[in-house]
Amino acid sequence: AAAGGGRDREGAPCLYATMSQQADNFFVLQIDPKTGATRQFSVDVPESNYTTAVYMGRDGRLYIGAAHSGHLFCFDPAADGLLDLGQINGDAAIFPCRIDEDGKGRLWIGSYGTADLSSYDLRTREFVRYGRMDETDMYNYPLVNADGTVACFIAQTLLHVVVFDPQTERRQTV
C-alpha cells in the first residue's frame, strides 16, 4: 500500500491510499482527512493486483503501476476516477518498480522482468520504450537527475547504476 496527499474533484485536500490484494485488482481509497469518509475506486484490467510503483505527479494526479498486468493507471481528481493509460511495455514489463517525472512532463518507469525503461509523455499521452538497461538483471528503479538524464538503479544480482541519456539514448554503467 502507498499513501499521499492530494485534492479531490472539488479541490479540497484529501488523502489517497492504494491497496493491493491477491484475490482481486487493486483499488484506490480517497480519504477526507476532516471526516474520515472514504470513497473507493477500482480498475477492470485483469491481473492488476498490486500497486508496485506509485507517484503523485506535479499535475495533481496519482500515477499507479500495476503488477501483474504491467499497466499504468492514473487517478485523475477532475475525472473523479481511475484511468487506464495502457500497457507500459508488453511482456517485458511484468510490473513497474518505480516511477519518476522529469522537467518536460514525462514519467519514467522502470520495470521488473527485463530491467527495462519506458517513458510516458503526459502531454501527448504516448509511451516510448527504450528497452533493457541491463542484460542480466531484472529490476530497474529509475530516478530523474536535474540534468534530465535518468539514473537506473539496477538490482538484484549485481547492484549498480546505469545512467541513461534520453537525448542520445546512450547508456553508461557507473
Feature names for model-found ranges:
Residues F27-L29, H71-F73, D116-S118, H160-V162:
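A short loop-to-beta-strand structural motif that recurs across blades of beta-propeller domains
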Residues L62, F75, L82-L85, L107, ...:
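Fold-core signature of tandem repeat domains
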Residues D32-G36, D76-D80, D121-R125, D165-E169:
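Short loop/turn segments that connect beta-strands within beta-propeller blades
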Residues A1-R7, S48-Y55, A93-I99, D137-V144:
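Repeated scaffold domains used in trafficking and secretory/extracellular systems
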Residues A1-F26:
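Beta-strand-rich domains and repeat architectures in extracellular enzymes and scaffolds
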Residues C14-T18, R61-I64, R106-I109, V150-F153:
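Conserved beta-propeller blade signature
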Residues S42-E47, G86-D91, Y130-E135, V174:
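Surface loop/turn motifs at the tips and blade-to-blade linkers of beta-strand repeat domains
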